[in-house]
Amino acid sequence: MASRKTKKKEGGALRAQRASSNVFSNFEQTQIQEFKEAFTLMDQNRDGFIDKEDLKDTYASLGKTNVKDDELDAMLKEASGPINFTMFLNLFGEKLSGTDAEETILNAFKMLDPDGKGKINKEYIKRLLMSQADKMTAEEVDQMFQFASIDVAGNLDYKALSYVITHGEEKEE
């Protein structure tokens, strides 16, 4: 008869296995396919795992060659083990589960729009994002603005941006 300790270990391993297999139920089939494509692009040596060299090569292919080893190590440490596709999905599942709902994002923007016009000056938002809380870089803010609707007066349509942030695409009128 197996000892209690052995049974407990086996049960924990099964629970961990079930938890990682449930990650697929957190995503739609199309999302899983998109993640698989991204994983395949990053797995440069095609061994089924993303390692430090794969990350370096991926960054290089994006034109960023000055990534430090400690930055890559920090990325890899976010995973609890080797990064195969299931682990890759787990990591994204954890990141995406922290994404604010559209209403929460809208409410945050509304705090900066006392007149309720649905628009905020782009330069004002940029200054806030680069100087408050989790400070963003100018590059990160500019990337975000690529998905924003900005009028000729330089005002950001935050309702449209909130939709893009939470749904990944512009709302069709």
From Swiss-Prot:
A cellular component term, taken from the record's GO annotations: cytosol
InterPro entries per record: EF-hand-dom_pair (IPR011992), EF_Hand_1_Ca_BS (IPR018247), EF_hand_dom (IPR002048), Myosin_RLC (IPR050403)
Keyword set includes Zinc: no
Pfam families, per database record: EF-hand_7
GO MF annotations, alphabetized: calcium ion binding; structural constituent of muscle
Tissues with expression: Expressed in fetal skeletal muscle and retina.
GO BP, one annotated term: regulation of muscle contraction
Domain EF-hand: 30-65, 100-135, 136-171
Entry keywords, A to Z: Calcium, Metal-binding, Motor protein, Muscle protein, Myosin, Repeat
Region (Disordered): 1-20
Domain of life: Eukaryota
Residues annotated to bind Ca(2+): D43, N45, D47, D54
Subunit structure: Myosin is a hexamer of 2 heavy chains and 4 light chains.
Additional note from the record: This chain binds calcium.
Name of the protein this chain belongs to: Myosin light chain 5
Organism of provenance: Homo sapiens (Human)
